[in-house]
Curated annotation (Swiss-Prot):
It is found in: Cell inner membrane. The lineage of its organism: Bacteria, Pseudomonadati, Pseudomonadota, Gammaproteobacteria, Enterobacterales. One of its GO terms (biological process) is phospholipid biosynthetic process. One of its GO terms (cellular component) is plasma membrane. It is a single-pass membrane protein. InterPro entries: CDP-diacylglyc_Pase (IPR003763), CDP-diacylglyc_Pase_proteobac (IPR015993), HIT-like_sf (IPR036265). This is CDP-diacylglycerol pyrophosphatase. Pathway: Phospholipid metabolism; CDP-diacylglycerol degradation; phosphatidate from CDP-diacylglycerol: step 1/1. The keyword Coiled coil does not apply. Signal peptide: none annotated. NCBIfam families: cdh (TIGR00672), PRK05471.1-5 (NF003986), PRK05471.1-6 (NF003987). Its main location: membrane.
């Protein structure tokens, strides 16, 4: 029985890994990088036109791009080569605080929507190495799922200033949660907080996905989930988002 159990476990892991691999490589993983480096950046530098991006900031090192999925979803991407959460560059002090820059760009959602979107409806997310389809770092700026919003509201007083397991998980997956102030988020990258504060995370950053959500007390919640093929968790923090923005119709 024990051998049979181990065999079944191995089969599950292999099937899960194969499924993730197919999902990841079934498209062009360099599509976003090509848009940034071959179109948006050259057009901005040569013609002062960011198209097809919404904004290009060469000196600050990032672009804002309207994603085709969802009416209000935008992406923040670097203007140079960074693959994703596994990149050592994200732990360098000179690297821009991409999450903070993404939060500052949330106004594009309101502009596209035609009305002010409350901060409580906005979320930021980046997927892990196996949880993404593109090999150019991109932070999703989009609406939060209404059920995730409700859960985080209910857990407001239970979320610590240290990385601790989020009560009840999220979307059936285990998450770590940490509360930070706006000042902390502005001054220190969530990538660094994860690498420096969660044991062994620094050596395995590519396994992690991260998300940032504003709370009703004006603090922020950092969320991190680690890849776990046994639980079919490919670490895609984008799962907390709803690109159809149903939360706006309920307000």
């Amino acid at each position: 029985m024990k051998k049979t159990g181990y065999f079944l476990l191995a089969v599950i892991v292999i099937v899960a890994a194969a499924g993730v691999g197919y999902w990841k490589f079934s498209g062009n993983p360099d599509a976003l990088r090509e848009i940034v480096l071959e179109r948006c950046l050259p057009d901005q530098l040569q013609h002062q036109n960011p198209a097809p991006c919404a904004e290009v900031k060469p000196r600050a090192g990032y672009v804002i791009f309207k994603d085709r999925h969802g009416p209000l979803q935008y992406l923040l991407m670097p203007t140079y080569r960074i693959n994703g959460t596994e990149s050592p560059l994200l732990l360098e002090p000179a690297t821009p605080n991409f999450f903070w820059l993404a939060w500052q760009a949330r106004g594009y959602m309101s502009k596209k929507y035609g009305h002010d979107i409350p901060d409580s409806a906005v979320s930021l997310a980046i997927n892990s190495r196996l949880g993404r389809s593109q090999d150019h770092l991109h932070i999703h700026i989009s609406c939060i799922r209404p059920d995730v919003r409700e859960q985080l509201d209910n857990d407001l007083t239970r979320i610590s200033t240290r990385w601790l397991p989020l009560p009840g998980d999220l979307m059936g997956h285990e998450y770590l949660a940490r509360r930070v102030t706006e000042s902390e988020l502005a001054q220190r990258s969530p990538f660094m907080m994860l690498a420096e504060e969660v044991p062994e995370a620094r050596d395995h950053m590519g396994r992690y996905a991260l998300a940032v959500v504003r709370q009703s007390d004006d603090s922020f919640v950092l969320l991190a989930t680690e890849r776990n093929l046994l639980t079919l968790n490919r670490a895609s923090a984008e799962e907390i988002q709803d690109h159809s923005c149903a939360i706006l119709s309920s307000r």
